[in-house]
């Protein structure tokens, strides 16, 4: 598999995407049906154009539907870019992409003991990544990816509207978190490319 994919200025309209993100409902990592939790807060999955809101089971309004359609179009763009960049033999129609908005603040750093060690993890799907959505974020609050065979860690800096995609099976983590509110915290559009036969794992 090739090295990480980094694309600056990914969203055509990052301010609009950020506004959508800050309007969404969020869940904490320990709210996801007993499965291992994520770090910080996440929106409900962005995967399909549903007429019913997953958080309240009410019919969505036209504005929400339009937002969801826009986000899914960007997710498809991410899928196509990753398919072109990464050399994965099994990367075919059996794979799909699930995305979320994800917020990590200073509170996230206290969410588990020894956070600097505990934050590192692997994903089940072949590709994962983020698009950073906090203007003027600390550069050192990006993404850290372990290359064990080379005994090194690659740190991708946090830059507004930068996309980074990487091998999800590599050990990785957010490099750091910051801010005290959703508006000032580390906001990202987080995505996973995974088997279409296993969507519930990404709820």
Give, region by region, the residue ranges found by the protein language model.
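Catalytic core of non-heme Fe(II) oxygenases with the double-stranded beta-helix
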Residues: 105-203
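Non-heme Fe(II)/2-oxoglutarate
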Residues: 1-118
């Amino acid at each position: 598999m090739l090295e990480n994919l980094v694309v600056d200025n990914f969203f055509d309209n990052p301010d609009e995407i950020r506004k959508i993100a800050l309007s969404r409902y969020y869940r904490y990592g320990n709210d996801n049906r007993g499965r291992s939790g994520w770090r910080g807060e996440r929106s409900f999955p962005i995967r399909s154009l549903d007429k019913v809101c997953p958080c309240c089971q009410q019919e969505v309004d036209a504005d929400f539907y339009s937002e969801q359609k826009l986000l899914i179009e960007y997710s498809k763009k991410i899928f196509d870019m990753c398919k072109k960049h990464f050399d994965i033999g099994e990367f075919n129609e059996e794979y799909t992409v699930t995305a979320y908005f994800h917020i990590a603040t200073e509170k996230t750093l206290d969410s588990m003991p020894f956070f600097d060690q505990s934050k590192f993890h692997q994903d089940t799907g072949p590709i994962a990544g983020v698009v950073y959505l906090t203007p003027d974020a600390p550069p050192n609050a990006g993404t850290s990816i372990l290359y064990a065979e080379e005994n090194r860690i690659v740190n991708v800096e946090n830059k507004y509207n930068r996309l980074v995609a990487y091998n999800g099976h590599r050990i990785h983590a957010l490099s750091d978190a910051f801010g005290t509110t959703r508006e000032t915290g580390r906001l990202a559009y987080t995505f996973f490319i995974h088997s279409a036969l296993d969507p519930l794992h990404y709820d």
